[in-house]
Amino acid sequence: MATEALHMHKDRLSAEDLDLKDPHVSSSLALFAIHNLIRRNLKACAEHAITVQPANIDAFVTYAKYTLHVLRDQLTSVDEIWFPVFAEHDPRFLAQKDAHDALYQRITAVDAQLATPPAELGQNELLSAEIAAAFAELHELTDKQYDLEEDLINQLGRKVPMDTIRGLEKKQEERRRADVKVYGHLWTAVYLLRGLDPKERAIFPPGIPKLIAGGMLTAGAMQFRR
């Protein structure tokens, strides 16, 4: 039935828990998975900001800035592509764009803090503590917002026709390809791999051969992930 809820949950994203043959479930999986990836990486930034060693400051700042970029891009994607269409079936999605404004402001503020020269950042314990607190707060606010949006997605169920969803997915893919041109396929793929848990990774691959993916994970190409 078109009104049937999806019953997806952020802690149960696996082939055992989901009917991946259901096109509405499989299409919603990407949203739930990227939410989890962002949750984990925001938390990682909060934890590492005050413990990172001076020799790794550059790597941490790069990772932290990209995490903010992914969050901003994800919010912009749903604001511009997905939620306006979903709002035709549930007007509560319109309110989410306004709710995102506070997150955009905090992202900009934290990004400005990360603009501090790495050498200075590594020696400024107070600033490091402020950045850690800012990431922790951003994680908390984002987590609550994502919980709400995932509940709305579940309630939306199968109301949006799959032909419409496929059109939205095409627009989303165009955004992803543009982003990859800027940051590189290897960087974005590794970032995805390191942020997903094994069960999520098994059903939401970022599009690179498993042999190469395994090598990346074994090599530990990115230190700051959780």
From Swiss-Prot:
Please give the pathway this protein is involved in: Secondary metabolite biosynthesis
Q: What does this protein do?
A: Part of the gene cluster that mediates the biosynthesis of the isocyanide xanthocillin and its derivatives. The first step of the pathway consists in the conversion of tyrosine into a vinyl-isonitrile intermediate by the isocyanide synthase xanB. Subsequent oxidative dimerization of this intermediate to form xanthocillin may involve the cytochrome P450 monooxygenase xanG, whose expression is coregulated with that of XanB.
Tell me what this protein is called: Xanthocillin biosynthesis cluster protein F
Q: Please name the source species.
A: Aspergillus fumigatus (strain ATCC MYA-4609 / CBS 101355 / FGSC A1100 / Af293)
Lineage of source species: Eukaryota, Fungi, Dikarya, Ascomycota, Pezizomycotina
Q: Quote the gene name from the UniProt entry.
A: xanF
